[in-house]
Curated annotation (Swiss-Prot):
EC number: 2.1.1.11
PROSITE patterns the record matches: SAM_MT_MG_PIX (PS51556)
NCBIfam families registered for this protein in UniProt: BchM-ChlM
Protein name: Magnesium-protoporphyrin O-methyltransferase
Pathway noted in the entry: Porphyrin-containing compound metabolism; chlorophyll biosynthesis (light-independent)
Described purpose of this protein according to its UniProt entry: Converts Mg-protoporphyrin IX to Mg-protoporphyrin IX methylester using S-adenosyl-L-methionine as a cofactor.
One Pfam assignment: Mg-por_mtran_C
An annotated Gene Ontology molecular function: magnesium protoporphyrin IX methyltransferase activity
Enzyme class: transferase
Keywords: Chlorophyll biosynthesis, Methyltransferase, Photosynthesis, S-adenosyl-L-methionine, Transferase
SUPFAM superfamilies: S-adenosyl-L-methionine-dependent methyltransferases (SSF53335)
Catalysis performed (reactions): Mg-protoporphyrin IX + S-adenosyl-L-methionine = Mg-protoporphyrin IX 13-monomethyl ester + S-adenosyl-L-homocysteine
Disulfide bond positions: none
Length: 230
């Protein structure tokens, strides 16, 4: 692991255990947020809804073993558990995991509760039918993201679903323009990834693309790839 990658992980963990936790808890919740944050909330929810719809449409979600890698506050884990999946959610932030546990207890009561744990993605073990990693790769450069994807692929018996910020000319220009305006929310680095690079990493790990999706709002862009073992 490079020092740069280690720095990124440290930045992400510390941010989401401090000021970032309150900010993103509001964004992923239903409280008052500003215009940009509300747009990000809508975009993230659209990505979650797309993935849940895929799994529900397959017709075998009840009892399916799913790993939600980088679960945040449980935005994906909870609806999957509601639909009957056996969900193991992990996040690098202890505070995020605590919030996810609290939300699951409130929403699911005594129903099918997800299992949440505080873990770096590189420490994840076990085997799952489906491994899902949404809105995480944006925090890491392609070199580190490649290692993460390869590790997640090793945990997936059948399917791996990823989302990432696509690296296109238009979005790169928007990102550079945004970087000209300083703000308190720019605490973590934001990395875009070429879709061809992500597809190659998946292919090198024995996966082929089954379904794709794209979420685009004013301030949120997320490419979704569902890959299955070839």
């Amino acid at each position: 692991m490079t020092n740069a990658a280690l720095d990124d992980k440290t930045i992400v963990r510390d941010y989401f255990n401090s000021t970032g936790f309150d900010r993103w808890r509001r964004i992923y919740g239903d409280g008052q947020v500003n215009f940009v944050q509300k747009d990000i909330r809508v975009g993230h929810q659209q990505t979650v809804d797309s993935v849940v719809a895929w799994l529900v449409a397959d017709g075998n979600l009840p009892g399916l073993l799913v790993c939600d890698a980088g679960c945040g506050v449980g935005s994906l884990s909870i609806p999957l558990a509601q639909a009957g999946a056996l969900v193991y959610g992990s996040d690098i932030s202890e505070k995020m995991v605590g919030e996810a546990q609290q939300k699951a207890q409130e929403v699911l009561a005594y129903g099918n509760q997800p299992t949440f744990m505080t873990q770096d993605l590189a420490q994840l073990g076990g085997k799952y039918d489906t491994v899902i990693c949404l809105d995480v790769l944006i925090h890491y450069p392609t070199e580190e993201a490649s290692a993460m994807i390869s590790h997640l692929a090793s945990l997936a018996d059948r399917r791996l679903i990823l989302s990432f910020a696509p690296k296109t000319l238009g979005l790169t220009v928007l990102k550079k323009i945004g970087g000209l305006f300083p703000g308190p929310s720019k605490t973590t680095r934001a990395y875009q990834h070429k879709e061809a690079d992500i597809r190659k990493i998946l292919g090198d790990n024995g996966f082929s693309i089954a379904r794709t999706g794209m979420t685009s709002t004013r301030f949120y862009y997320s490419r979704i790839l569902e890959a299955v073992r070839s």
